[in-house]
UniProtKB/Swiss-Prot annotation:
Family per record: Belongs to the HAUS6 family.
Record protein name field: HAUS augmin-like complex subunit 6
InterPro entries cross-referenced by the UniProt entry: HAUS_6, HAUS_6_N
Subunit and interaction comment: Component of the HAUS augmin-like complex. The complex interacts with the gamma-tubulin ring complex and this interaction is required for spindle assembly.
One BP term from GO: centrosome cycle
Major location category of this protein: cytoplasm
Annotated GO MF terms: microtubule binding
Keyword Zinc: no
Amino acid sequence: MSKLKKTDGKYLWWCLLCLKFKPDNVSVTKTTKHLNLGMNMFDKPNKEAFYIVIHFLFNKLNPTRAQDVFRNCWLVWDHKSDAEFRKVAFAWLQEIANEEGSAFPKVAASHLLSAFGPKFINLMLHLAKHVMLKTMKTFNTDGMWVPEAAAVPASSEEMELKRFQLVKRQFQRVTVEQDFLIQDYQKRAKVLEKSLRDLDAENAKYDSLLKEHDSITDLKEVILAKVQKLRGLWNEVDRFLSNHQGKRDIVASVINGQVDQYILCGQELNVKMPAALRERMERPSHQSSAVRLYEGGQPVLVRLLALLNEGLHVLREEREKIVGPSVQLQNQDVQEHALLFTRSKENLNLIRWKLVKEDAAEIKVSIGKLEEEWECKWANCLKNTPLTCFLEEDPVLDLVSPMVALSFEPASEASFQASVISQYPCKPHDLLEQPSKEKLDTTVAVVHLEQEVHLKPEIKISSVATEDQDVLVPSDSCFSPEHVTCGTPPCETILSVIETPSPKQPCHTNLHSKPKASVLKTKAQILDLECDNLASQFADAVIMSPGNQRSDVDLGQLLNAISDPFSSRKQLCRTPESLIKDVRSSWRKAVEEGLAEKKQASWNQQDSLSWLKTPMANMNSPCKTLNLESSMSFSTNLDNCTSPPVQQGSTLHSTLSWDSSQMEVLTSQCSSDVIKFSIAQEEPPDLFDVSFNSDSSVENSGEKARDEELCLPSVGLCYLDETPQLTEQLCLGASSDKSVFKDSPVHLSMSKDLSHWTTDHFSLDLDRLESLSSPPRAENLTLPNLVNVNLDEY
């Protein structure tokens, strides 16, 4: 019976696998951790397996009906859904059993209550076979063959032959697969049998080892218990023996024969009693205790001890009767010592008062004088030598290293050794006494460089302040055209464009230049060279950024700092921003003083607008051509080639540094040698920001015009009715794109030699500066006056 039960369970599991049952992808209840699916799943009650198998078979038989019937009880979550599931399954099983010609066994409700046992397994096996039969009848792969058609008689021999061949092929395929399965099963069985025998042998071996280990463990436990018991007995014996050690010694002495070996004999003992003790013993109070000390010629030890005790009492009483000598204090000696100590204390207090009142004041005064002398010495020392020279081993390394123009990279070791800083002290004393002379020399050097500024193009920079830093944004530019003669047309092709360098882009062309061997010079020569070098640097910085709007410092303070370039207490700033900030005010003051002296000469000249009234016919024909595409410059070369005079009292609206008349005074040249420029070289103001009314533009500009006032020349007033062509040119210039000015001759005004000299001149290397030659003399250029165009009358 058990064998049949196992066989039915195995067949049931195989049928489920043939129907594509996947035990890994099932879920029936909330907790499926202990789900048991396999051949022995119904050996014990297994509700979860019952739910899964029944639902799978009914869903395989009729999916639509199964979904409709089990929609309220699948998945099974509680007792209510469990009862509903059993009810639906029982009804469906009864329908299958009641079909005609069905061999399905009789179904009872009790079969579904306990999902285990042979009857339940047999019921599930018949249900699985029924589902397999229904599935086989509906099997169709290509729509050409149905199993039920095999029972229909063949219509011809060919059809019967085809059926036979089809069945034969299927039978052969199944047979081959079955044979392959059997062979594979046999191979695996052999391998498993061998491994099973090995495992059995290993299991037997480990069982024997386990038994031996258990027996040894038990034996050790028995031995350990006996040892503990024996140790307890020995402890008890030791405790008993220690308590009866005296008795043991007596027994041992008796056993060893040590009894009666020693006898206390007092025959030779004679007791002598003092008179005081004898009298005491003869008193009536001691008569009762008075006994004989000898009995049978031997002294009695107990009585002798009692007599000794009485003798001790007598001795104590006699000692109490004796009175010892009394201690007498010598008060006179103590008083003498106290008086001596008091006098010594008064003398010490007197000495202390004298030290505090007299000597301490003198010592403090002397200490103060010494401190003042030390402070004076230290201050004088610091004036001559910086503090960092005392703190470091090499004081020269603390100074500013020689650098190229606007470069913050340190120079090489060879440059350090050849520099002036390594050969001369940090602060020459003989030059400190002549600050006024150095200041005057520096001022003259700055004014002397005024004529060199005309050789470079000027760009107006408007400062735009942001939260983090000041960004220089270029605005309207002032262009200086190339030299135009009457025989050369102004539309000449421009071959190269050289942009004006920015002060924020330091030049690094001579970063690796090797310094020459230093020649010994006097301190005055070194100072003069350094001042000239710094003045040239200041001029270049002011030309590159005339629009830097920052707080100005006093020229006197700046020149005092320049007078001693090697002073470590007040070193010069080595950043482009700080150089421009410190130089700008001093340069403006120098230019303002020059302008004030030269403005007197320009007031007596003729009206500045007289040159505009010159008829256009007097001009040469090549000079009349306007080339907007190539240079965007409107250049009019006058016949007389004289610079236009400046009208006295005219408003300042020019972005140029100074006019042509001022250049004539500085360069001491005649006006006929100077090239004239027209208004076309000036960019008109922005129509959205500044109106064409020059008077209102000055009022709206505010602080910006105040900063540019020092470098603006006097400009005459012009009306559009007098110069219609000039107004047309101005409108064309304002509407044209500013990007075209990149090819204008202003970028060609700075030649290669001049740009190289201005780039390399910004250096603190005096040897290298001495070797440099003066900049090549470029063509003398003058800048025209701007014309105020007033549209109010039109």
